[in-house]
Amino acid sequence: MLAVPASRATTPRRPRIGVVKFASCDGCQLTLLDLEDDLLAIADRLDIVEFAEATSNRSSGPFDILFVEGSISTPEQAVDIVRLRAATSTLVTIGACATSGGIQALRNWADHDAVRSLVYPDPEYVESLATATPVADHVAVDAELRGCPISPDQLREFVTATLAGRRPDLPDEAVCAECKRRNVVCVAVAEGVTCLGPVTRSGCGALCPAYGRGCYGCFGPRESANGEGLATWLGRDRDPADTARSFALFNAWSPPFRRVIDAAGGPPGPIDGRSIKEPADA
């Protein structure tokens, strides 16, 4: 077989990777940086062209893979995500904010102007949408990495699987399955602790139940989650508002959790639209 002359040899193009954020805390981006040695091991196989947390490089595309953190909460963000989608081959949302709206989506149940007046001294200068929504409400999403923050193990699996050309193995079982594997006693049955494990997607390693606390639903509802069924069981001996409060956290705006909250009349607490007064007339 004839050898290819050096002048004619070709090197496969490294995939162009971007990481961007919208309304979020940056925690999921930091999870990517926390991979440290694992990230360095594959760095020469990637071309990171946009990642404000890690590099001064800037790019508006095109991207082979774009990781998106954060919910869409402003008119500018709604425009930007459409532009980024058009410049991206594979768009991956990372974290509860991007996949379900995040903790800030609790404001979706309240009066928009009332919330702005409560938070900002001069709300007329703040442009925001009436709702904070997941990226998938605005553009097509190719893959989701859930969690608050995301799991470094799942992130590592996604990146390595994508580079190897295989489908990532991202489980959709309940947190309860992780408790069984770790021999963690069910806190809901044994201790009467409120736990969203039966309806929450696995990925955390049953972290909270392992320390005797109920699952807070950080990874959002699993595909076949029966939120209403769990709410009925939890609500046997407690006020419906307390049950709704259990679902009104990081993934409150996800449909299975939202239905439970809606049935209770909205999320209780200080962000509740019933407890925020209308802004006073100037």
Briefly describe each language-model feature range.
Residues 1-67, 77-78, 82-90, 113-282:
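Iron-sulfur (Fe-S) cluster-binding modules
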Residues 70-72, 96:
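Short glycine-/small-residue-rich Rossmann-like dinucleotide-binding loops
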Residues 92-94:
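Active-site neighborhood of phospho(di)ester-bond hydrolases with catalytic His/Asp-centered motifs
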Residues 97-102:
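Short gly/pro/ser/thr-enriched loop/turn and capping motifs at secondary-structure boundaries
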Residues 105-106:
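Active-site-proximal loop->helix
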